[in-house]
């Protein structure tokens, strides 16, 4: 795996990016195509969840990262017309044990159904998924499209994730078919 520092001005981190829909903030991690600063072309955008797991082991909340920079560079050779802008949205795990579940769950948890191994006294309610999707569509996407050279149309906008990130990706793709034309659903928590 390459160190993320090797990607220089291609890798951007937006600290404490506001999430008004959820009265919160989050780090947003952006990887630009290798040719971004060598051309004036626009690029499609892929929004991904669990952003801290995409690029850099030092900030990952799990034991492994997706190695997105290596995968993207292998898939898109250094042609000025190839590439995609990857936007990683950090999850809410730093805001509480189950905050990630709250944001990635479109529907509230049925508290009368006990889940094995879960503490019923923990304030995990879920049901914030629609607000999270609204943040992506109406706040984050507007920022990305305004500050980077993107193709903002639905044919060039995708969303992807794994586990609960896959779950919310599928929900977003169904809910906002006017925005997302492609969805990556990896090992979904369905």
Which residues does each PLM region occupy?
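Non-catalytic cap/lid and distal C-terminal segments of serine-dependent acyl enzymes
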Residues: 1-190
